Amino acid sequence: MTQRFSFTRLGQDGAARLGRINTPRGEIRTPAFMPVGTAATVKAMRPESVRETGADILLGNTYHLMLRPTAERIARLGGLHRFMNWDRPILTDSGGFQVMSLTGLRKLTEQGVTFKSHIDGSKHMLSPERSMEIQKLLRSDIVMCFDECPALPAPRERITESMELSMRWAARSREAFGDWPGHALFGIQQGGLEEDLRGKSAEALRAIEFDGYAVGGLAVGEGQEAMFGVLDYAPGMLPEDKPRYLMGVGKPGDLVGAVKRGIDMFDCVLPSRSGRTGQVFTRRGVVNIKNARHADDPRPLDEDCTCPACRSYSRAYLHHVFRAGEILSSMLLTWHNLHYYQELMQGMRDAIGAGDFAGFEARFLAQQAEGDIAPV
């Protein structure tokens, strides 16, 4: 008999939750951060290296994979896990966010979204039913329902229409997903910055019943203060016994603030994208390795970090390979950033378990405020 998807709460400190998601492909410790493998790869990283950073799960992108190499081809080759050599859980987004971002290249109707590929201009259709079909072909462990995500700020009327459409699409996604033992379907709460609309969305999703719930429609231009304002109430509208996922977030401070408010799961391209552009996350804030101040610095990025970049290379060397445009720079800095994010999540898990999340947050903010070490 196939093991079913489940979520166990192991502890709580204020609204911050410690938990474990069980899947047939392994356990996911929560709060969890998912590296983004857009096109079946976390850029500049081998799958084995991603696992070594401490990641229990990664994210794949339905929109990009449906266009290239296509979900049908991946299915013929044994599914996304075998295709990319990742034997741990995978969450796939629905493709909705990317499609909605194609301004001028898409047409939105009740049925779904017709759009032109950014690769070759070919015409495609994404609907709740097609999104579920693609994610099943990929054999995703956690499937996201198809939704619309308008950019903020937006008029209340636009947010209302979008939320109501997303709830109708959520019901169609649930029906198309059916019963797929060992796999999970997450609903996505919408409603922008409007508390009453968030409440109506949560009520509709609870009636449909999902295996987990995402807080969607944030990190789309509203800023951290407004995002935290929504997170002060939105997670509490969702079932306590199911995981809560904040999509597309974020910076280290965003993660700490969101965990404080009851979020269990995150994804973001920031640590990998920043690594490729010389932006490095440390306990003392962001380091710009391209800056000339690092050219003669024999010290590691972070003396307490155990990633390969910090164990074996100096700031001077990392500065050199970045300025020289060497591929090794992207590999090492991405590894460091992902390692830092996973260490941050482990620190939060430990703090929740010890009943010291407030202390953890205070220490985190104090260290970040100190800034980088003085130049040599």
From Swiss-Prot:
InterPro entries reported in the protein's UniProt record: ArchSynthase1/Queuine_TRR, TGT, TGT-like_sf, tRNA_ribo_trans-like
EC supergroup of this enzyme: transferase
Pathway assigned in UniProt: tRNA modification; tRNA-queuosine biosynthesis
Region of interest (RNA binding), ranges: 248-254
Cofactor section: Zn(2+)
Residues bound to Zn(2+): C305, C307, C310, H336
Record function comment: Catalyzes the base-exchange of a guanine (G) residue with the queuine precursor 7-aminomethyl-7-deazaguanine (PreQ1) at position 34 (anticodon wobble position) in tRNAs with GU(N) anticodons (tRNA-Asp, -Asn, -His and -Tyr). Catalysis occurs through a double-displacement mechanism. The nucleophile active site attacks the C1' of nucleotide 34 to detach the guanine base from the RNA, forming a covalent enzyme-RNA intermediate. The proton acceptor active site deprotonates the incoming PreQ1, allowing a nucleophilic attack on the C1' of the ribose to form the product.
Record-linked NCBIfam families: Q_tRNA_tgt, tgt_general
Protein name (database record): Queuine tRNA-ribosyltransferase
Name of the coding gene: tgt
